[in-house]
Amino acid sequence: MAKELTFEQQARAKLLEGINKLAKAVKITAGPKGRNALIEKKYGAPLIVNDGVTIAREIELKDPVENMGAKLIAEAAISTNDIAGDGTTTATILTHEIVNKAIEAINNGTNPVNLRIGIENAAKLVSEYLTSVSKPIKSIDEITQVGAISSGSKFIGELIAKAMDIVGPSGVISIDDAKSFDTTLDTTDGLEFKGGYSSPYMVTDSEKMLSELANPKILVSLNKINTVKEILPLLEASVESSAPLLIVASDIAEDVVTALAINKLRGTLNVVSVKCAEFGEAQKNTLEDLAISVNTILVDSAAGIEFKDLELNKLGSAEKVIISKDKTTVINGACHKDVLAKYLNNLKAKSANLTSKYDKERITKRIANLSNGVAVIHVGGATEVAQKELKLRIEDALNSTKAAVEEGIVAGGGIALMNAIEVLKQVKESNPEIALGYEIVRSSLTAPARQIIENAGQNSSKIINNIINSKQLGYGYNAETNEFVNMINNGIIDPTKVTKTALEKACSVAALLITTEVAINDELKEEKPSLNHL
């Protein structure tokens, strides 16, 4: 197909148009008084969302160059969400602000390469500053605050904090649809391990890129699966029984993965294959733990167990399994309580005899993974639309809370980024074009707070100046109550990881975009006039 090429200022102008359109749609969701977006769905009712990354994923623009600009800024949001689980709106706002200012500078003759150096260096300094002021969180109240701020609901914050209290900070928390209007918390047996689906063609939810299996049969193998022939009897039995099949192995040959994916796409076989991402002894331990938790025999040549020794009724099972690209969560495995208790006691006895701190920690994690279970938040709603919207908010809040436990918290409402302005003011840079890159980032750090204030219907310039002139660390504006407060003391906080990732991804995408000199896309075909009216 022929290609269309758009160069230099014309290319940047069109890319910028796409960036501005997507950013305008996402920015309105920022803060406690952020607005909603209504998204048309191909089937069913439209989706009402207050979630930046969901909006970003849905936007497709008609003009191909504009669409490339929109996809680039969406990449900042999606990458932030993938790493930190939240912060997508902040990433979008920052990218939009930095790119607009940088392109204006380039159009006025500034060298984009030098500008890029300044932007990337500034991002590094601000990231280091955020790490230095990060405050670790430990108490249930602090965890509640993070969840409440992210979701805009104290109830959701309390629900997540309670779930974390039950399964531990690194425990497994799953989110599921409720069969009633109420949103509740439940705990069940289960575990999680590293390793996702072998092929994206195995996903059942293309929006979230997840695969979910209800009541699957589960094959667990320490042996590599080299050919389809090795497991063919089990595949045929799975088809005959209409039972979903989960295959977890130390390794799976590419030919096998391809064959399984093709049969999955054809609807012949409801199967997901997973390669355990651990190695060596850790991999063996993970597969042994999984086999116990789902009540099956581990295929292991060293122990004399081969694929031919297993029938479908000897495979394990679980109430539900959720598989992402990099992890697998097993909920309510069919393990016998007495067998699991004996297995855990053996692990504890083994741990007591170990002298290596590393080995002890590894067994402790295995015991916790097997015994803490899974906390399940069942999300209800008066309508399907309300349920979906609430589910998205809970997912964001859970991700934010996990990020806060991992790396601590900073002042929320965009204030931590504003506090970092002083760090960039102190930079002495002899190259004026690199210095301009620093200045662009510095002047963009007020953008998230400004947007939150504007979404609350207030005069952002006046409030921003008040905050800057106060020169108090953590002093900011509570958009919910319309007053100036110490943000951390009043529970208005953001996870450090989320804020850092949003800034880093925004600067990274902006730096790539401003050094773009040509946009290449498929040539648009002219639409033939319709003859329907004749």
Curated annotation (Swiss-Prot):
A GO-annotated cellular component: cytoplasm
EC code(s) of this entry: 5.6.1.7
Any GO MF annotation of the entry: ATP-dependent protein folding chaperone
Major place of residence: cytoplasm
Signal peptide: none
Locations listed in the record: Cytoplasm
GO biological process assignments: protein refolding
Keyword ATP-binding recorded: yes
Catalytic activity reported: ATP + H2O + a folded polypeptide = ADP + phosphate + an unfolded polypeptide
InterPro entries membership: Chaperonin_Cpn60_CS, Cpn60/GroEL, Cpn60/GroEL/TCP-1, GroEL-like_apical_dom_sf, GROEL-like_equatorial_sf, TCP-1-like_intermed_sf
UniProt-annotated binding residues for ATP: 29-32, 86-90, 413, 494
Alphabetical keyword list: ATP-binding, Chaperone, Cytoplasm, Isomerase, Nucleotide-binding
Superkingdom of the organism of origin: Bacteria
Enzyme class: isomerase
Subunit structure of this chain's protein: Forms a cylinder of 14 subunits composed of two heptameric rings stacked back-to-back. Interacts with the co-chaperonin GroES.
Function summary: Together with its co-chaperonin GroES, plays an essential role in assisting protein folding. The GroEL-GroES system forms a nano-cage that allows encapsulation of the non-native substrate proteins and provides a physical environment optimized to promote and accelerate protein folding.
Protein family membership: Belongs to the chaperonin (HSP60) family.
Name of this protein: Chaperonin GroEL
Annotated source species: Mycoplasmoides gallisepticum (strain R(low / passage 15 / clone 2)) (Mycoplasma gallisepticum)
Origin organism lineage: Bacteria, Bacillati, Mycoplasmatota, Mycoplasmoidales, Mycoplasmoidaceae
Gene from which this protein is expressed: groEL
